[in-house]
């Protein structure tokens, strides 16, 4: 139940009822069809809710807006409503002030919803896939993967809370150029182990990390030199499969440690082995979107994108300046490109598995691939423009003692996800990486482990633990949290109490916005604001030592804040410790 929406709906009902009453009495012209717009004022000194109905309706009535507002206020009956007063302000605003019934009903609604508080049905019946991380299985996961993991996992949770059926997927790039480069890197280290470091030159564009040395050593210890003199393909296949058999379980383990589990790990190789890549390329050919040149098969990407841009109103001259290019789907050697496999993979998501919406979390460096992939889906008749959404996330910079920690996966000096989790608590990692995806972020390693109010995750968890300690202390004295119906909630009249309840009422709207905008960082910001509202309430409104009716009502409010804090922390994958 969204108590803010309920209050807004009641303002509209009261306003319309007052207008109809005044019109029936001949005090206002009949026939006005203006829908009352209701907002929460930025300055609550002006009331809790306001409507601009009179400003809009007065034009049609050819009357002074303040006169219309006063007539409505005189005709309005607030008895039994959530509001105690309505005031006229400015040129004709009608400002409504909440009464005790709304505050009591809000606490009761949160109690009734329990763990389901904040849920909405805006995406009910929709089948969503969120594909995220999908790191190359050729080495340790880096900070971009760490950020993408949190964003994808938390977004999936937020979408679920908005009613969607959500599928989490990791796309394993176990085919193509990256795997060949992986095999050649392992091969060079394998040869060096057998023949000596200086006897074999390492590929300049290979993977230089220590993990490659370790994999090659493990392969040698298992197989010896049996692959030294065999044909290259056999050796490459054996090395690559061995490396993947070590790396992929390690990735799964690290992500599970990070609180991330997938519904499916989908392997690129399966698309090739099943013939689905070839089938998907043929589907594009059948629709007239491919052509052959220099022995290769090309997608008419420029034609597809130009058509889309014309639909958006772009002129041919503007389109020509973009320098759109076509893409190779099948090389002259007969091998399919990564783009061809990606098209097949996304066709599988829509045409085979029937997802209504697919969301990919990508690094911002992939921005050039977005329109191409959406266009390919459009060409296949799968409405990529509306069904495929790409969330682009900016780079991550690690900062320690005010200095940026440089990352370079190929020089072997990268800080991996494993390294990060060894140093920083999972809760802090998940909190800080759950920032707005379009902003470049600096992850302050020092701040993440601080135990003070400067660290937002600590600040929020401390508020939760503080409430748990309070409940435990009062329980020892014989006071238990009452049900909302048994508490005398009408005594909660202090500004800090009302502010806290209003903040608690915001949660469902925050969840809705996080899902709508694909931005789960809404939850983080809300939790900090909720923790601040609780601390102000706790510092201003004494609980122990008060009259029993006040003590129990404030105890109920504190416990309600505890429940919503836990709800939000759970949603973003952070723990809610009962003591710090």
Predicted regions located by residue number:
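Non-catalytic interaction-recognition regions
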Residues: 2-104, 111, 115-580
């Amino acid at each position: 139940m969204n108590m803010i929406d309920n209050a807004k709906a009641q303002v509209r009902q009261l306003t319309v009822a007052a207008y109809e009453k005044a019109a029936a009495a001949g005090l206002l012209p009949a026939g006005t069809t203006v829908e009352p717009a209701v907002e929460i004022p930025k300055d609550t000194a002006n009331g809790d809710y306001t409507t601009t109905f009179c400003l809009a309706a007065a034009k049609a009535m050819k009357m002074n807006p303040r006169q219309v507002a006063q007539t409505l206020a005189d005709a309005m009956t607030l008895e039994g409503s959530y509001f105690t007063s309505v005031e006229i302000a400015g040129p004709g605003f009608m400002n409504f002030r909440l009464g005790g019934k709304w505050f009591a009903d809000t606490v009761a609604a949160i109690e009734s919803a329990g763990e389901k508080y904040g849920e909405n049905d805006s995406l009910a019946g929709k089948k969503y896939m969120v594909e995220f991380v999908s790191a190359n299985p050729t080495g340790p996961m880096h900070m971009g993967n760490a950020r993408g993991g949190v964003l994808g996992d938390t977004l999936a949770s937020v979408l679920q809370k908005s009613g969607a059926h959500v599928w989490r997927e990791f796309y394993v790039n176990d085919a193509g150029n990256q795997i060949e480069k992986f095999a050649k890197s392992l091969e060079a280290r394998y040869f060096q182990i057998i023949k000596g470091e200086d006897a074999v030159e390492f590929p300049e564009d290979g993977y230089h990390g220590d993990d490659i040395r370790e994999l090659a050593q493990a392969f040698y210890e298992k197989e010896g030199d049996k692959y030294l003199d065999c044909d290259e393909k056999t050796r490459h296949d054996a090395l690559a499969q061995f490396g993947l058999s070590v790396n992929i379980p390690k990735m799964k383990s690290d992500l599970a440690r990070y609180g991330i589990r997938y519904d499916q790990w989908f392997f690129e190789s399966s698309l090739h082995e099943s013939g689905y890549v070839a089938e998907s390329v043929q589907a594009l050919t059948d629709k007239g979107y491919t052509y052959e040149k220099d022995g290769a098969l090309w997608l008419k990407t420029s034609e597809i994108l130009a058509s889309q841009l014309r639909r958006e109103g772009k002129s041919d001259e503007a389109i020509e300046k973009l320098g759109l290019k076509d893409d190779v789907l099948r090389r002259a050697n007969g091998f399919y490109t990564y783009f061809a496999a990606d098209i097949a993979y996304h066709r599988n998501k829509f045409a085979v598995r029937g997802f209504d919406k697919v969301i990919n979390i990508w690094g911002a460096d992939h921005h050039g691939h977005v329109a191409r992939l959406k266009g390919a889906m459009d060409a296949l008749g799968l409405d990529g423009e509306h069904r495929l959404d790409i969330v682009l996330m900016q780079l991550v910079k690690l900062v320690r003692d005010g200095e940026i920690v440089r990352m370079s996966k190929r020089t072997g000096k990268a800080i991996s996800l494993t390294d990060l989790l060894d140093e920083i608590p999972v809760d802090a990692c998940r909190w800080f990486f759950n920032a707005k995806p379009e902003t470049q972020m600096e992850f302050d390693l020092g701040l993440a482990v601080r135990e003070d109010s400067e660290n937002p995750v600590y600040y929020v968890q401390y508020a939760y633990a503080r409430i748990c300690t309070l409940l435990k202390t009062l329980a020892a004295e014989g006071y238990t949290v009452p049900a909302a119906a048994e508490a005398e909630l009408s005594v909660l009249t202090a500004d800090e109490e009302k502010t806290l309840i209003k903040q608690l009422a915001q949660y469902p709207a925050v969840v809705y916005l996080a899902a709508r905008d694909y931005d789960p960082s809404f939850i983080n910001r809300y939790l900090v604001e909720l923790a601040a509202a609780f601390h102000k309430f706790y510092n201003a409104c004494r609980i122990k030592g008060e009259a029993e009716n006040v003590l129990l009502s404030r105890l109920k409010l504190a416990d309600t804040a505890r429940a919503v804090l836990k709800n939000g922390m759970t949603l973003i994958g952070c723990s809610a410790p009962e003591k710090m």
